[in-house]
């Protein structure tokens, strides 16, 4: 498909000259604010789609570098006649045709196009100066047929009337006063009223709502269970949070209850409406919860009445000032630790918070599409089950406007952790656009549909299903993953053929097995791009490699450093499909990534190994030396490919520095590497190859994919790579989705919102509460987990052994629990455990092939483990439990099937808060001296700081090492919460505790996740104090292990098991 042209016209408007800082009051054909050396003009943008759908976008832009004169007011003046055609002629840029173009994407592409045109030398207007920059400052959008191409645009926060009159009054819409001469500010105001509500007293929070008090409130049900909230915006459309539909995407599975106050929907006013279409915002980011909005189309119009009314959508210029009291409503949980939904709709008053203040509370992870509400001291908040519900603010007219949509937060009503809501004023244009174009959705409809085998954007793409830790209730993943194999830690990023990995300095030939994840993509015998092994069926490459490629003719060559296939263990294999990132932009090579599925799985050996995928929060610091490799040109202009794989060492370059070097604002999906003096770089033919960084001795993580650059190895022109951390979620989503039923190989663009699923249990320490910290090592063994997914020995070197205790006594809570009847040896650190020494220890095996996580027996048919163990593999049929054996092989153990997996509903994939899961076994275990449960703690204060407890597991016995063949035990010391927060300042919640030693040396490690932190009481009973969760590396000084505090989730556990 040929790209279409977006014609950008900057058309000067006559205007009255005003002071530089004053707002301009504009009439029908006037626009502009005048300041010294600054001209503010309207950009009219005509986007001509091949589908013949046209949109006209008026933007206000600040043009800098040219002088303003009064002659610009006259269309007949020389200045006016010089400026207009110059801009019309010069400001053109190409857009790849999209299925639809959202407002957010339109504005971003427009700004990039303008900057690209002005990048070199600006646009000279002779005597009037040179335009050096054009920054967008405002917009209005509507169908081309409805809006005159030359219409004006109001500046700043001025309200734009239907006749282009500008109104500077604050929030003039629907205030029962006509401010526009055409009355458009009071049109469409049958909204936000409470006709059934007569007692609008002041709401203080935590109260039951009366019937008809929130007539716009909807309950979204999946399988007859309330899952999320929503708000009515017109008779056929609801608005909710996009993350509500990560797990369940088929609109036919959803039913909306409106007009209801009771969760049962028993009132006569309740209407049950079937959902026919779900449209997520195309820029929704499940990693950050940015653009967290979706609209739902109903099968038939709603009957408006006293109990069913729409809420008012605010204008984009509507101001909701900080400290304004607003209302939230929903059927979410009443308390964070009381997981029962109320029968009656709840309401509460919250206060809008200053954006900068909220950003400081959440580590500056807020975007302009978010708004915070609540109180600094907590106590009032939305909670799980409220997601998608409304945050409404009453204006003097008595109408309620939708200020926000319940999105996310840390915990519920915690101090200094207010609720975060999607800001509707920033999203209302897209909402209106999506709901007025029901016949051509702007984002993927969630009805399942296989992606078409075409290189064009599919008309009904399937949206991948993942779970995201926000305020919606977590549901178990039902995506079967039997056919996916993602490498475990010790199987990824290693180079078994290299006994002593030498330091890469650049420009050398590589030996077979030195870069075992390197792939050559060939059409026939022609090498055209590189690729990288990330799984037994999966490769990553650059999307631009497949612009003009027939997938069925492509073969992947790997297992050898020779382009001719000599030496090593060469393998040639076809491709099943190629999935390009849905936001791939060939113009600027943004989102330049493709996932390649192989026709058959690889057999890993010392010449073929996957590289480790980093976590979304992993950092590759500036200056870090990483390795690039490929068979690309060895010098610029020389098209001869080397016969031997080339490798070179490059340094990570600061993003801002790189943007300056390229005079182009690099996106977050790009990362630069090389040297300012040039000399070392990737080149033509290397595209799609790896930029791999050695994060632990001999363990490499994929930081980037070779994408683009100017020339090769030129001075101050480093290579630009696709940043994997930003796209990790999408990669895993494709790898975790069902294979599409395609006979021929295909290239697909999957338009979908995705959320990263770690392949090995996420790890957290991070800079913000919503994301884990770089270097946080997940304790799961299996897939790559984080930047320093290395493991430290559970050896306690020279530590005081755990003191012997008197004989255990019977406990009324759980008969026989917490007793260790077999001989209890003294713990000296890092020693092997004997049979029956820790009878509650369980080994969880994935597909009965390998140990993946630990678990703890807490009742006859219940195990407790870490929720992050099941992020990727959530199907209980894939898991088996071995009990009663200290041997990693499972020898002499009791094998039990897992029937169900229940993650804690508050589990947060990114912060690892509430990192706990219950596993229900298919049948009760056979108790013996080798198999018995541990005691659960009472919901009482934690053991005293400094208490010595025991950790056990089969995890790595040293950072970066292999698994222990026999169960290991070590003594650790409980650290105070204050000490823990000193080591991990941001990410420690009240559901976490730290254990270890400040000097390091003793810790749990990769493969220990889900295992027990057990403390012995004076009575002799062993009590489960913590569940192994995460940490930075293993056994490092000042980075103790972090455990889920079991007492904090004791109530939830008790709801599931009967003791």
UniProtKB/Swiss-Prot annotation:
The record marks 202-203, 503-504, 826-827 as: Cleavage. One of its GO terms (biological process) is proteolysis. The active site is at 243 (charge relay system), 292 (charge relay system), 387 (charge relay system), 544 (charge relay system), 592 (charge relay system), 687 (charge relay system). The keyword Cell membrane applies. Keywords: Cell membrane, Disulfide bond, Glycoprotein, Hydrolase, Membrane, Protease, Repeat, Serine protease, Signal-anchor, Transmembrane, Transmembrane helix. PROSITE patterns: LDLRA_1, LDLRA_2, TRYPSIN_DOM, TRYPSIN_HIS, TRYPSIN_SER. Residues 443-469, 758-814 are annotated as: Disordered. GO terms for molecular function: serine-type endopeptidase activity. Expressed in fetal human tissues, such as kidney, liver, lung and brain, and in a variety of tumor cell lines. Weakly expressed in adult tissues including skeletal muscle, liver, placenta and heart. Residues 203-436, 504-736, 827-1058 form the Peptidase S1 domain. Residues 780-798 have a biased composition (Polar residues). Its EC number is 3.4.21.-. It holds the Pfam family Ldl_recept_a. It is an enzyme of class 3 (hydrolase). It is a single-pass type II membrane protein. Residues 51-1059 are extracellular. Proteolytically cleaved to generate 3 independent serine protease chains. The cleaved chains may remain attached to the membrane thanks to disulfide bonds. It is unclear whether cleavage always takes place. InterPro entries: LDL_receptor-like_sf, LDrepeatLR_classA_rpt, Peptidase_S1_PA, Peptidase_S1_PA_chymotrypsin, Peptidase_S1A, Tmprss9, Trypsin_dom, TRYPSIN_HIS. Residues 153-190 form the LDL-receptor class A domain. The serine protease 1 and 2 domains are catalytically active, whereas the serine protease 3 domain lacks the essential Ser residue of the catalytic triad at position 1009 and is predicted to be inactive. Belongs to the peptidase S1 family. Serase-1 and serase-2 are serine proteases that hydrolyze the peptides N-t-Boc-Gln-Ala-Arg-AMC and N-t-Boc-Gln-Gly-Arg-AMC. In contrast, N-t-Boc-Ala-Phe-Lys-AMC and N-t-Boc-Ala-Pro-Ala-AMC are not significantly hydrolyzed. PANTHER family: ACROSIN-RELATED, TRANSMEMBRANE SERINE PROTEASE 9. This is Transmembrane protease serine 9. It comes from Homo sapiens. The lineage of its organism: Eukaryota, Metazoa, Chordata, Craniata, Vertebrata. The gene is TMPRSS9.
């Amino acid at each position: 498909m040929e790209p279409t042209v977006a014609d950008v016209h900057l058309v000067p408007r006559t205007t009255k000259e005003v002071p530089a800082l004053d707002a301009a009051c504009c009439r029908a054909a006037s626009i502009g604010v005048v300041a010294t050396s600054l001209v503010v003009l309207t950009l009219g943008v005509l986007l001509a789609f091949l589908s013949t759908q046209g949109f006209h976008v008026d933007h206000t832009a600040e043009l800098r570098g040219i002088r303003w004169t009064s002659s610009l007011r006259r269309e007949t003046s020389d200045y006016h006649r010089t400026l207009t055609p110059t801009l019309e002629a010069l400001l053109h840029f190409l857009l790849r045709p999209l299925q639809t173009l959202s407002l957010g994407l339109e504005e971003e592409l427009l700004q990039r196009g303008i900057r690209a045109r002005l990048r070199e030398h600006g646009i000279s207007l002779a005597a009037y100066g040179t335009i050096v920059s054009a920054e967008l400052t405002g917009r209005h959008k509507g169908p081309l047929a409805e809006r005159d191409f030359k219409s004006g645009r109001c500046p700043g926060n001025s309200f734009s009337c239907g006749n282009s009159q500008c109104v500077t009054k604050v929030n003039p819409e629907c205030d029962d006063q006509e401010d526009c001469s055409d009355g458009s500010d009071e049109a469409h105001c049958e909204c936000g009223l409470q006709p059934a509500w007569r007692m609008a007293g002041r709401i203080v929070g935590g109260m039951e709502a009366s019937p008809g008090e929130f007539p716009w409130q909807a309950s979204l049900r999946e399988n007859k269970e309330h899952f999320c909230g929503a708000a009515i915006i017109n008779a056929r459309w609801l608005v909710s949070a996009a993350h509500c539909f990560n797990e369940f995407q088929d609109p036919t599975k959803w039913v909306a209850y409106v007009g209801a106050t009771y969760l049962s929907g028993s009132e006569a006013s309740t209407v049950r409406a079937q959902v026919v279409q779900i449209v997520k915002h195309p820029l929704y980011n499940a990693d950050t919860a940015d653009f967290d909005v979706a609209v739902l189309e109903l099968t038939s119009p709603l009957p408006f009445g006293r109990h069913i009314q729409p809420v008012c959508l605010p204008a984009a210029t509507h101001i909701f000032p900080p400290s304004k009291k607003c209302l939230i409503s929903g059927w979410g949980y009443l308390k964070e630790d009381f997981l029962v939904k109320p029968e009656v709709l709840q309401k509460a008053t919250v206060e809008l918070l200053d954006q900068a203040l909220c950003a400081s509370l959440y580590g500056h992870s807020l975007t302009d599409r978010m708004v915070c509400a609540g109180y600094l001291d907590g106590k009032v908040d939305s909670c799980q089950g409220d997601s998608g519900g409304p945050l409404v603010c009453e204006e003097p007219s008595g109408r309620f406007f939708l200020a926000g949509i319940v999105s996310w937060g840390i915990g519920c009503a915690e101090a200094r952790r207010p609720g975060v809501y999607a800001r509707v004023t920033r999203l209302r244009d897209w909402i209106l656009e999506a709901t007025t174009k029901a016949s051509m959705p702007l984002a993927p409809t969630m009805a399942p549909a296989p992606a078409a085998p075409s290189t064009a954007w599919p008309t009904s793409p399937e949206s991948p299903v993942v779970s995201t830790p926000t305020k919606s209730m977590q549901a178990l993943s039902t995506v079967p993953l039997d056919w996916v194999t993602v490498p475990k830690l010790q199987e990824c990023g290693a180079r078994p053929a290299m006994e002593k990995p030498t330091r890469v300095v650049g420009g050398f030939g590589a030996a077979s097995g030195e870069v075992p994840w390197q792939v050559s993509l060939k059409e026939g015998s022609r090498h055209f791009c590189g690729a990288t092994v990330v799984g037994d069926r999966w490769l990553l490459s650059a999307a631009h490699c497949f612009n003009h490629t027939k997938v069925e003719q492509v073969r992947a060559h790997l297992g050898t450093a020779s382009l001719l296939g000599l030496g090593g263990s060469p393998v040639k294999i076809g491709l099943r499909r190629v999935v390009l990132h849905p936001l791939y932009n060939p113009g600027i090579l943004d989102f330049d990534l493709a996932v390649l599925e192989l026709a058959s799985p690889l057999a890993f050996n010392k010449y073929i190994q996957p590289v480790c995928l980093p976590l979304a929060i992993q950092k590759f610091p500036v200056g870090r030396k990483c390795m690039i490799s490929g068979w690309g040109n060895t010098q610029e202009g020389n098209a001869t490919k080397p016969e031997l794989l080339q490798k070179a060492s490059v340094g990570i370059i600061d993003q801002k520095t790189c943007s300056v070097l390229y005079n182009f604002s690099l996106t977050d999906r790009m990362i630069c590497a090389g040297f300012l003096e040039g000399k070392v770089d990737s080149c033509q033919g290397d595209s799609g190859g790896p930029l791999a960084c050695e994060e632990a001795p001999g363990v490499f993580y994929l930081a980037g994919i070779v994408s683009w650059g100017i020339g090769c190895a030129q001075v101050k022109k480093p290579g630009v790579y696709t940043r994997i951390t930003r796209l990790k979620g999408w990669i895993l989503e494709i790898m975790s989705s069902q294979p599409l039923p395609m006979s021929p190989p295909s290239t697909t663009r999957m338009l979908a919102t995705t959320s990263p699923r770690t392949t090995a249990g996420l790890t957290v320490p991070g800079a913000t509460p919503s994301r884990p910290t770089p270097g946080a090592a997940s304790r799961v063994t299996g897939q790559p987990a984080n930047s320093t997914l290395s493991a430290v020995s559970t050896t306690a070197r020279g530590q005081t052994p755990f003191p012997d205790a008197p004989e255990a006594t019977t406990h009324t809570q759980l008969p026989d629990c917490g007793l260790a009847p077999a001989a209890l040896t003294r713990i000296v650190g890092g020693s092997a455990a004997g049979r029956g020494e820790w009878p509650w220890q369980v080994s969880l095996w994935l597909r009965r092939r390998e140990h993946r996580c630990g678990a703890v027996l807490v009742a006859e048919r219940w195990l407790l483990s870490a929720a992050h163990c099941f992020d990727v593999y959530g199907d209980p049929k894939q898991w088996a439990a071995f009990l009663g054996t200290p041997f990693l092989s499972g020898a002499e153990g009791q094998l039990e099937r897992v029937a169900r997996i229940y993650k804690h509903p508050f589990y947060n994939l990114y912060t690892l808060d509430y990192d706990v899961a219950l596993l229900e076994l298919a049948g009760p275990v056979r108790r013996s001296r080798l198999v018995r449960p541990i005691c659960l703690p009472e919901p009482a204060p934690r053991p005293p700081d400094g208490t010595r407890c025991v950790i056990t597991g089969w995890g790595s016995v040293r950072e970066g090492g292999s698994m222990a063949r026999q169960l290991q035990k070590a003594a650790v010391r409980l650290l105070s919460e204050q000490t823990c927060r000193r080591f991990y300042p941001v990410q420690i919640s009240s559901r976490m505790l730290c254990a270890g030693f400040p000097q390091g040396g003793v810790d749990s490690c990769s493969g220990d996740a889900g295992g027990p932190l057990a403390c012995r009481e004076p009575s002799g009973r062993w009590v489960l104090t913590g569940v192994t969760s995460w940490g930075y590396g293993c056994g490092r000084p000042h980075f103790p292990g972090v455990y889920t505090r079991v007492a904090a989730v004791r109530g939830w556990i008790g709801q599931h098991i009967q003791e």
